[in-house]
């Protein structure tokens, strides 16, 4: 049976920034969905402006993994929807948060912390080191992945200690690395 994934995106940049719209004509959620579908996953998308933000009870009940992309509209997410997602995660649904979703209501509720971290945007190189090479999520990856130009997210990242640390990252501009992929007992991998 295929993994059932729902990709959620606030879908704000695509509506307000022509450059983003050109890169992601189907939205960031559409680009992510396409990649996951190419890997044999059953994928649907949901966005902030849909009723219930596209995360109805039926959608959540038929989701094994929820991918959450957020950046600037965290406070627009309904507390009712956050509570539904929270309960589904506690019941076993996986959650993967991307980009600035570390400040999303759902991630902060799950972590029980501020989820604050250091950040800068100077277009520097990042190297993501695999620190748990036997973990299934890094199957087929060498010692590291290198991104030639990215934003820096750095420690201290105010989250609880993870059950498993799979990647740490290093940035060309200095500053401490950040724990990139953290897996807690209720997160999917």
What positions do the PLM features span?
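A glycine-rich, often tryptophan-bearing local segment used as a flexible ligand/cofactor-contacting loop or short
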Residues: 73-143
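Short aromatic-enriched loop/helix-cap "lid" or pocket-rim segments at secondary-structure transitions
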Residues: 17-20, 108-110, 179
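Short beta-strand segments enriched in small/hydrophobic residues
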Residues: 2-15
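Catalytic beta-strand/loop cores that center a nucleophilic Ser/Cys/Thr
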Residues: 120-189
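Conserved beta-strand termini and adjacent loop/short-helix elements that scaffold enzyme active sites
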Residues: 8, 46-49, 167-170
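Short, solvent-exposed loop/turn elements at domain surfaces
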Residues: 13-17, 175-176
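Residues that line or immediately flank small-molecule/substrate-binding pockets and catalytic motifs
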Residues: 9, 70, 118
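Helical hinge/lid and interdomain linker segments adjacent to catalytic or ligand-binding clefts
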Residues: 21, 25-104
């Amino acid at each position: 049976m295929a993994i059932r994934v729902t990709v959620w995106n606030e879908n704000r940049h695509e509506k307000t920034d022509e450059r983003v719209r050109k890169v992601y004509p189907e939205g960031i959620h559409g680009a992510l969905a396409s990649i996951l579908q190419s890997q044999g996953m059953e994928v649907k998308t949901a966005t902030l402006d849909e009723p219930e933000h596209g995360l109805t009870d039926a959608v959540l009940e038929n989701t094994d993994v929820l991918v959450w992309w957020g950046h600037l509209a965290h406070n627009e997410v309904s507390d009712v929807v956050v509570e539904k997602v929270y309960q589904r995660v506690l019941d076993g649904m996986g959650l993967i948060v991307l980009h600035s979703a570390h400040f999303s209501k759902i991630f902060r509720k799950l972590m029980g912390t501020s989820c604050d971290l250091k950040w800068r945007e100077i277009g520097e190189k990042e190297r993501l080191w695999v620190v748990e090479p036997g973990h299934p999520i890094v199957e087929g990856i060498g010692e590291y992945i290198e991104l030639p130009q990215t934003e820096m997210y750095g420690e201290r990242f105010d989250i609880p200690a993870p059950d498993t640390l799979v990647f740490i990252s290093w940035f060309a501009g200095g500053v401490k690395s950040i724990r990139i992929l953290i897996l807690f007992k209720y997160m999917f991998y």
